[in-house]
């Protein structure tokens, strides 16, 4: 009958315990293997009888090339394998003394050794758990060590492997000398450590020793003995190897910086900056995003505009010299744009999505991240601080400027119900790869608030300075890295200003970096105007007018110059582009593509122009029109019209185009022609159609009474007032300018401040009395371009009807926030009952402006300690066509304050001293 493993070996335990002294006498016979008969007689069984390990032993014997019961004994405990905990509780085995067995079979003696003299372990194998051949084969199939060690592994896999408990490993270590083979460092799935084979020939042992000595020279230093007993120990060397293999390959990965400096130490603000030697990447490599982040850090630390421009310019010089293809992504990252305005790409990532991505990327709790964001007021700082808590075994490659910009565009293109989850996945991937301050600026860019004070004009100035000092198109190494070297400070400044004007004028006509940058890199700055010219299909920033308080001011401004007065229509600016191939595009004041909003206008273009007209750009105002009454409708009616993908058959609100300027005609730019010439060409090449396309009503006169009557008539005709423009002198079309050569004279201007203001709603106060249960007042703010802040300017509570108050309450309650946005500044203003997400823009009129110690708007621009506030503000309307960044700026508020008659009388200044501003 088949016996268990324990009963198979148990009868011999006493016999072995009584003969320990005869172990030494058998040392003379260690060189010869014992006869098989003696082994069988000692076992008391025949090899073909009831041994429970006979078959596995024979199968292994064919592999090992040895015979007899010796192999059976070596493999027999595999069937009776026990947990390591049980083995650790077994008392040390007694030494065997059987005279029939030689030293190679008696592994329990403290002096036991192999035929070659290698010390043997002293534990009784019959009580040790052993693996089956199947387990060994499975481990062999999972072995993924490098090819250099494969020969050694094949030798080791021929030997049966045994498990050691912690106590046994410690005991074995005490008896081993320095030459004894140690556990190989290859990773295993189990905790079983390999031990020397007990029955091998002397040549085999010698060969094995040579292989082990070879490995000793190549493998890393031996770990502490205590780690050998850990259940997970075999995995640790594998992890270490993976890290070591990753390190040498990491710098070679795409986008990794191998320049003379590590990106973390990059400093574009240093004096005497060298675009090649001080860069942190090599020629042809992608610009590390960390270099961009370090540049933003340096810009954030200073407030002087010239210093900010110089710092950004130094980065751009390195990009031009080393990685020209990355110039466009770096510029867009600096502007926090995703492309030209007409592409309509916006990130649309709210703070909630950002915080969720931060939490998932760093393993933090979402509530903890939200609490920190509320405390710090800056999602960027929260992302940066959270990043330091994350540890990765295999860190992703370093971020590159082009890679980050590409991810931003991917996020902007996502639409649909699952877009939020996809956005979070992309953002999470960016955060995981962030180093140092990268997370701060990625989070800020995604939120749409980079908070650097880098306006568009500053970025253009930095670009012109970069390509002037370090001209593009040079062979590497560039022969000229500082073209201004040798010039005096004054001459250098004048030269850079002249170069900057070239780029500025070109950008006004072609406000599309996608077109400008390739030409700039190929032909240089001085030849840029030759290759980038105004053309249909690329929207322009329109020319705007300055406000004026009365007719007398108009006459004083223009003096002897001829001028014209036109109706100022209350609608939306529409820039009509007709391309050579017949395609028509319509753009808004903000260069947004509104072509899909006005299919009715596009359909009427062929009949409003003469056949000789092949291409043009018209400046017009789209106004709501009542076809039955044949009159202009209020602006609010126009805002009810659908904005996107409008079906012409479903249009409820009809529009009429009022054309007042012609900018481009049949391949020729007209921006440098006087208004009189542009107006003549407009009327000669286009045909009026009532209710569809009409020229702006105008009057050419210098008579004050006629102008006053014309103003009153414009109001009766549902217009806002008049636009007064010079006809011949200084009468060019000034793109992107708020020019003093165009003055707006509204009916409201005759009493009061001279202009309305477009302000952002940042808070709401709960109403009382008849306004109880809804908002009764609102906190408004102007926009500061330099600090990118919204600065509180007044509390508004008048000008609303009951219906309007209810509408505002319903629309604004969805914008309620637990705390103000970090870029909202209120100083001493009364804290509102509800903070609002600053997205709504309202047009407001006031009696005048006054200095205020409470409100921070324009503080420091007129008075060093006081801001400016509105007296008796009154709500006019909602400006749905404006974003918060397009609201009245603090600089404009200061300008309006200075232009008040009583202030001018005190200062003895003329309003003409105000500089014309590019917006």
UniProtKB/Swiss-Prot annotation:
Q: List, as start-end ranges, the regions of compositional bias called Acidic residues.
A: 136-145
Residue sites binding ATP per the record: 566, 573, 621, 725, 744
Which Gene3D superfamilies does this UniProt record tie to the protein? 3.30.1490.70, DNA ligase, ATP-dependent, N-terminal domain, DNA ligase/mRNA capping enzyme, Nucleic acid-binding proteins
Instruction: Report a single Gene Ontology molecular function.
Output: ATP binding
Indicate, by first and last residue, each region the UniProt record lists as having compositional bias (Polar residues): 98-116
Extract the coiled-coil ranges from the record: none
Required cofactors, per record? Mg(2+)
Record's NCBIfam families? dnl1
Q: What is this protein called?
A: DNA ligase 1
Instruction: Provide the taxonomic classification.
Output: Eukaryota, Metazoa, Chordata, Craniata, Vertebrata
């Amino acid at each position: 009958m088949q016996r268990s493993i324990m009963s198979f070996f148990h009868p011999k335990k006493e016999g072995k315990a009584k003969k320990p002294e005869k172990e030494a006498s058998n040392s003379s016979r260690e060189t010869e293997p014992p006869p098989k008969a003696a082994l069988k007689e000692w076992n008391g069984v025949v090899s073909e009888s009831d041994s429970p390990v006979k078959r596995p032993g024979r199968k292994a014997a064919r592999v090992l090339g040895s015979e007899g019961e010796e192999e059976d004994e070596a493999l027999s405990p595999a069937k009776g394998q026990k947990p390591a905990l049980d083995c650790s509780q077994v008392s040390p085995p007694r030494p065997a003394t059987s005279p029939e067995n030689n030293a190679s079979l008696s592994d329990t003696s403290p002096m036991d050794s192999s035929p070659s003299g290698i010390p043997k372990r002293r534990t009784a194998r019959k009580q040790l758990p052993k693996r089956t051949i199947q387990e060994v084969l499975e481990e062999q199939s999972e072995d993924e060590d490098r090819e250099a060690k494969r020969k050694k592994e094949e030798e080791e896999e021929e030997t049966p492997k045994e498990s050691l408990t912690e106590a046994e490993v410690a005991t074995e270590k005490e008896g081993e000398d320095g030459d004894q083979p140690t556990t190989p460092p290859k990773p295993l799935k189990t905790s079983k450590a390999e031990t020397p084979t007990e029955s091998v020939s002397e040549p085999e042992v010698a060969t094995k020793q040579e292989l082990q000595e070879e490995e000793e020279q190549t493998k890393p230093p031996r770990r502490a003995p205590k780690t050998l007993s850990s259940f997970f120990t075999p995995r640790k060397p594998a992890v270490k190897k993976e890290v070591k293999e990753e390190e040498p390959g990491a710098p070679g990965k795409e986008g990794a910086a191998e320049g003379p400096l590590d990106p973390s130490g990059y400093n574009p603000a240093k004096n005497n900056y060298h675009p090649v030697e001080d860069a942190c990447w090599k020629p042809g490599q992608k610009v590390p995003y960390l270099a961009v982040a370090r540049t933003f850090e340096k810009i954030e630390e200073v407030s002087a505009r010239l210093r900010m421009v110089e710092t950004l310019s130094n980065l751009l010089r390195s990009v031009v010299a080393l990685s020209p293809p990355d110039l466009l992504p770096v510029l867009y990252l600096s502007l926090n744009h995703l492309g030209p305005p007409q592409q309509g790409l916006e990130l649309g990532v709210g703070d909630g999505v950002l915080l969720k991505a931060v939490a998932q990327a760093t393993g933090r709790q979402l509530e903890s991240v939200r609490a920190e964001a509320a405390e710090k007021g800056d999602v960027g700082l929260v992302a940066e601080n959270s990043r330091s808590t994350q540890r990765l075994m295999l860190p992703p490659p370093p971020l590159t400027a082009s890679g980050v910009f590409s991810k931003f565009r991917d996020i902007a293109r996502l639409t649909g119900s699952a877009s939020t989850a996809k956005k979070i996945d992309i953002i999470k991937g960016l955060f995981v790869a962030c180093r140092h301050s990268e997370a701060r600026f990625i989070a800020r860019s995604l939120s749409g608030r980079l908070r650097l004070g880098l306006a568009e004009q500053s970025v253009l100035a930095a670009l012109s300075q970069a390509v002037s000092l370090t001209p593009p198109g040079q062979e590497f190494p560039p022969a000229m890295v500082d073209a201004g070297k040798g010039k005096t400070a004054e001459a250098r400044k004048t030269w850079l200003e002249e170069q900057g004007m070239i780029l500025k004028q070109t950008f006004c006509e072609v406000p599309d970096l996608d077109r400008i940058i390739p030409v700039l890199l190929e032909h240089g700055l001085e030849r840029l105007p030759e290759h980038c010219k105004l053309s249909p299909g690329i929207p322009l920033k329109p020319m705007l007018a300055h406000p004026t308080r009365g007719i007398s001011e108009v006459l004083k401004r223009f003096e002897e110059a001829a001028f014209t007065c036109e109706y100022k229509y209350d609608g939306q600016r529409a820039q009509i582009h007709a391309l050579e191939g017949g395609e028509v595009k319509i753009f808004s004041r903000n260069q947004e593509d509104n072509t899909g909003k006005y299919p009715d206008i596009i359909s009427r273009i062929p009949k409003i122009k003469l056949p000789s007209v092949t291409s043009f750009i018209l400046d017009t105002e789209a106004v709501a029109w009542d076809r039955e009454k044949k009159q202009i409708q209020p602006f609010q009616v126009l805002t009810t019209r659908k904005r996107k993908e409008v079906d012409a058959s479903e249009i409820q609100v009809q529009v009429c185009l009022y054309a007042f300027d012609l900018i481009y005609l049949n391949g020729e730019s007209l921006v440098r022609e006087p208004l009189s010439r542009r107006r003549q060409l407009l009327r000669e090449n286009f045909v009026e159609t009532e209710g569809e396309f009409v020229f702006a009503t105008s009057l050419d006169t210098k008579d004050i009474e006629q102008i006053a009557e014309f103003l009153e008539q414009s109001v009766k005709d549902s217009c806002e007032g008049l636009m007064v423009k010079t006809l011949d002198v200084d009468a060019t079309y000034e793109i992107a300018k708020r020019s003093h050569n165009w003055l707006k004279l509204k009916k409201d201007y005759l009493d009061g401040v001279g202009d309305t203001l477009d302000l952002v709603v940042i808070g709401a106060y709960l109403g009382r009395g008849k306004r109880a249960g809804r908002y009764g007042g609102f906190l408004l703010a102007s926009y500061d371009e330099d600090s990118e802040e919204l600065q509180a300017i007044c509390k508004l509570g008048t000008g609303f009807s009951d219906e309007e108050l209810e509408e505002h309450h319903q629309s604004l309650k969805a914008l309620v926030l637990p705390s103000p946005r970090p870029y909202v500044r209120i100083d001493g203003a009364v804290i509102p009952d509800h903070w609002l997400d600053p997205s709504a823009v309202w047009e407001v009129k006031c009696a005048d402006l006054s200095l205020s110690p409470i409100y921070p708007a324009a503080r420091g621009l007129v008075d060093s300690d006081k801001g400016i506030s509105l007296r008796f503000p009154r709500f006019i309307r909602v400006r749905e066509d404006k974003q918060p960044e397009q609201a009245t700026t603090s600089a404009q508020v200061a300008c309006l304050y200075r232009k008040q008659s009583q202030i001018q009388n005190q200062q003895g200044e003329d309003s003409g001293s105000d500089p014309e501003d590019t917006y």
